[in-house]
């Protein structure tokens, strides 16, 4: 550990969803191991309030909400709330005196990024999605360094493509995918986020029943809160309860990825990057209400590489999944090739590349 006088400091702004928080935590842990002091800026009512302290980092909160797509009164009040949040963020910056401020998405990134530039602190932005969010789109005009996970995300500013930081434990899984070619029963992991995905809960029981008529298949299905009993009952009604493991939430995604031969899931930025890193083929059903339909653009990275199939939600039913899963179950060599193609597009050193951008700016002083 460097002594206190020389210790570099970073203020990280990331919150709201796992797609923002988990990549930021990967960078925070890396920099902390390099002797950096890390502090976080977020909002008190989102997941970062719980997760960040659990990982050993101090966090400050801003009183800020999203303004996109909300009512007129909130939009009218937004400039005043944003100004107040900028002042709150500036107070944190003056107290902590970071060498670098990094924004990775979430409500706090906007006012925190503005406060950083007003304070003369270098600002690094990282955009996880293939289409930038509104905050990063605006801040990219004033940021010192702009990073993105996917090529051609920003069209009007210079940005470096560095991938999405993910946990090193998942990267280590990527070299062990040959089992998909050898095992008899196709192992299908179904995940729809912490709330589950209704479309998967509706169609997967019928899909398992249909595929099982010609090919052995087992399912690990994450159904989301308050859906466990109803989805379990549907599998049981179709006589498939012996071939499925149903859970509200999967805490150990490392174990789930290690178990799976193929994944049925949404195409959030972090999910797409994790699938690439672990070398898993997938059936991707983008969330149809995502802002700017960014999940469809995220999915294209794997689809164009031949590592995934894109299934628009309006076209998804049990018969569509039966067709795709039966095809994969009957052609294990192609299934393995899809996994290899996924691994080929992975950016395995994304955490280090994002961290290095921060280190480089700090060294410039």
UniProtKB/Swiss-Prot annotation:
Keywords assigned by UniProt, alphabetized: Cell cycle, Cell division, Cell inner membrane, Cell membrane, Cell shape, Cell wall biogenesis/degradation, Glycosyltransferase, Membrane, Peptidoglycan synthesis, Transferase
| Alphabetized NCBIfam families for the sequence | murG (TIGR01133)
- In the UniProt record, does the keyword Ribosomal protein occur? no
The record's listing under Gene3D superfamilies reads:
Glycogen Phosphorylase B
The domain of life is Bacteria
Query: Could you say which protein family the record assigns here?
Result: Belongs to the glycosyltransferase 28 family. MurG subfamily.
Q: Please state what the protein is called.
A: UDP-N-acetylglucosamine--N-acetylmuramyl-(pentapeptide) pyrophosphoryl-undecaprenol N-acetylglucosamine transferase
**Record-linked Pfam families:** Glyco_tran_28_C, Glyco_transf_28
Q: What class of enzyme is it?
A: transferase
What residue range is the signal peptide? none
What reaction is this protein's catalytic activity? di-trans,octa-cis-undecaprenyl diphospho-N-acetyl-alpha-D-muramoyl-L-alanyl-D-glutamyl-meso-2,6-diaminopimeloyl-D-alanyl-D-alanine + UDP-N-acetyl-alpha-D-glucosamine = di-trans,octa-cis-undecaprenyl diphospho-[N-acetyl-alpha-D-glucosaminyl-(1->4)]-N-acetyl-alpha-D-muramoyl-L-alanyl-D-glutamyl-meso-2,6-diaminopimeloyl-D-alanyl-D-alanine + UDP + H(+)
Q: In which pathway does it act?
A: Cell wall biogenesis; peptidoglycan biosynthesis
Q: Which organism is it from?
A: Shewanella piezotolerans (strain WP3 / JCM 13877)
**Any idea which positions bind UDP-N-acetyl-alpha-D-glucosamine?**
17-19, 129, 167, 194, 250, 269-274, 295
CDD domains associated with the record: GT28_MurG
What EC number(s) are associated with this protein in UniProt? 2.4.1.227
Query: Which compartments does it reside in?
Result: Cell inner membrane
One GO biological process from the UniProt record?
A: regulation of cell shape
């Amino acid at each position: 550990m460097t002594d206190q006088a020389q210790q570099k400091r970073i203020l990280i702004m990331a919150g709201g969803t796992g797609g923002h928080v988990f990549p930021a935590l990967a960078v925070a842990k890396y920099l902390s191991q390099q002797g950096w002091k890390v502090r976080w800026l977020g909002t008190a009512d989102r997941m970062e309030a719980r997760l960040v302290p659990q990982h050993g980092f101090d966090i400050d909160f801003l009183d800020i909400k999203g303004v996109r797509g909300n009512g007129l009164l909130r939009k009218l009040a937004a400039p005043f709330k944003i100004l107040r949040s900028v002042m709150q963020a500036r107070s944190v910056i003056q107290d902590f005196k970071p060498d670098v401020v990094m924004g990775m998405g979430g409500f706090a990134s906007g006012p925190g990024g503005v406060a950083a530039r007003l304070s003369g602190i270098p600002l690094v932005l990282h955009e996880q999605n293939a289409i930038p969010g509104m905050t990063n789109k605006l801040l990219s005009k004033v940021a010192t360094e702009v990073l993105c996970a996917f090529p051609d995300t920003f069209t009007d500013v210079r940005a470096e493509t560095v991938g999405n930081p993910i946990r090193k434990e998942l990267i280590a899984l990527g070299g062990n995918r040959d089992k998909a070619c050898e095992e008899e029963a196709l192992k299908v992991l179904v995940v729809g986020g912490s709330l589950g995905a209704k479309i998967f809960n509706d169609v997967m029981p019928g899909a398992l029943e249909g595929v099982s008529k010609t090919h052995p298949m087992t399912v690990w299905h994450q159904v989301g809160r308050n859906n466990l009993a109803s989805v379990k009952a549907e599998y049981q009604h179709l006589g498939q309860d012996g071939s499925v493991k149903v859970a509200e939430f999967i805490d150990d995604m490392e174990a789930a990825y290690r178990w799976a031969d193929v994944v049925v899931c949404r195409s959030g930025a972090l999910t797409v990057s994790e699938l690439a890193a672990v070398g898993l083929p997938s059936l991707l059903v983008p969330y149809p209400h995502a802002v700017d339909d960014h999940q469809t653009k995220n999915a294209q990275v794997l689809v164009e590489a031949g590592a995934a199939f894109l299934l628009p939600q309006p076209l998804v039913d049990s018969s569509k999944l039966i067709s795709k899963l039966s095809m994969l179950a009957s052609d294990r060599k192609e299934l393995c090739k899809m996994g290899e193609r996924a691994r080929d597009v992975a950016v395995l050193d994304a955490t280090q590349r994002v961290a290095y951008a921060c280190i480089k700016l700090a060294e410039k002083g």
